């Protein structure tokens, strides 16, 4: 995946199908966004972000109100405990594309990079008025050993998950963090300490 591919637009049927891309566009450039594009008759697009937050504390209502001022999301996102709530504007079949956030960088034994988040995609039938809870994963804190990147998810109002993408691992003191995976078996990151 190249940085340019994060901005690709896929068009779907004008009548019933819509496309939603929920991603951390910064998997390559560290600019953490969650983009939701609705390609229906009106061609609306919505870009959700982490409202300029990173680390373990999620955004507040004030953070997101400021972030979305002057956009199509202004006044349409409610934040509760760092999770954004949004109401589906039109019924249809949606493709949702989700990216987890990158892990934090590490600097203990050198300069190491956090692993990139996983990418997941799925198709869903959504109804107008349905409430979705959206969490945009936040980049892990960079330190001597970086923190893990946050996962991104979209769930229904009853907490039924629609789609989840795990975050990347934080960089250790002696190596880069591992990327998020899409398999159920997970991934182990381990290194060997070698004194300098």
What residue ranges belong to the model's regions?
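Feature for long, exposed domains in two main contexts
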Residues: 1-42
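Boundary/junction segments of secreted and surface-exposed precursor proteins
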Residues: 1-10, 40-67
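A mature extracytoplasmic/lumenal domain signature
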Residues: 5, 36, 98-102, 136-140, ...
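Surface-exposed coil/turn segments at beta-strand junctions on protein surfaces, enriched
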Residues: 11, 25, 89, 115, ...
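Short solvent-exposed strand-capping/beta-turn motif centered on an Asx-Ser/Thr pair
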Residues: 23-28, 89-91, 101
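Extracellular beta-rich ligand/substrate-recognition surface
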Residues: 68-80, 107-117
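Extracellular and analogous surface-interaction loops
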Residues: 70, 75-78, 83-94, 122-130, ...
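Secretome/extracellular-domain signature
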Residues: 114-196
């Amino acid at each position: 995946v190249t940085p340019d591919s994060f901005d690709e637009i896929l068009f779907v049927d004008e009548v019933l199908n819509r496309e939603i891309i929920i991603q951390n566009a910064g998997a390559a450039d560290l600019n953490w966004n969650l983009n939701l594009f609705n390609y229906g008759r009106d061609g609306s697009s919505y870009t959700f972000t982490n409202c300029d937050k990173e680390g373990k504390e999620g955004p507040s209502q004030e953070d997101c109100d400021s972030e979305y001022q002057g956009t199509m999301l202004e006044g349409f996102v409610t934040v509760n405990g760092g999770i954004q709530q949004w109401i589906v504007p039109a019924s249809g079949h949606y493709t949702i594309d989700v990216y987890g956030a990158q892990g934090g960088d590490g600097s203990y034994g050198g300069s190491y990079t956090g692993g990139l988040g996983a990418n997941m995609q799925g198709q869903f039938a959504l109804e107008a008025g349905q409430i979705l809870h959206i969490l945009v994963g936040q980049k892990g804190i960079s330190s001597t050993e970086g923190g893990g990147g946050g996962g991104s998810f979209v769930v229904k109002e009853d907490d039924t998950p629609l789609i989840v993408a795990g975050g990347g691992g934080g960089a250790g003191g002696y190596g880069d963090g591992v990327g998020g995976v899409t398999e159920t078996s997970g991934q182990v990151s381990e290194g060997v300490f070698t004194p300098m």
